[in-house]
Amino acid sequence: VREVASGAFLSVGLKHGTVSSKQEAVKKGFEILEMGGDAVYCSHSIDWIEAMAKEGIPITAHVGLVPNRATWTNYRAVGKTADEALQVYQNVKDLENAGAACVEVEVVPVELADFITKNTKMITMGMGCGDVCDTQYLFCNDILGTNTGHYPRHAKKYIDLKAEEEKLQALREKGFRMFVEDMNSGGYPESKHEIKMDSIEFEKFQEKIK
């Protein structure tokens, strides 16, 4: 990705559960930066985020609807009640105090997202919470229309790439069927597809193997 997008800000995910200690997290964080990442997305514990941040690794944290914790809340907006909003905001301040540089704010009410953005030093990256965050993000399969499942309310499809991929797949299948039919009917290969050997050279070959 870095090779084709040299000017893009890349926050590379440290998949939840792939490391089992703060030391491993720090090591993996440095590996991500060495690969060309600008920041490390991390939804692990505050302690781990703090350990990575202390080593100078820019961390992108996550509040609101956090997919790997969705079994706690289901896939729904988070922060619509005063108590939930307070918990989300407290999470933001805890992450800020731990040294995170950015925070994804996902599927929270626009009022809460606006308040968070105005009251944190972190860069806020919003999805599903209006236009009040510092930056916006969407998943590429939503943008390009390759998502075969449910499209969330906040998503916007710009291109129906799935339909184009289905057309391409139909053409692939058609091409393979044409090849099989052509081969079975004797239409392929034709003489123009063959490599010819000089007759004298072929005679010499036959002499050599006698």
PLM region spans:
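Alpha/beta enzyme core
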Residues: 1-210
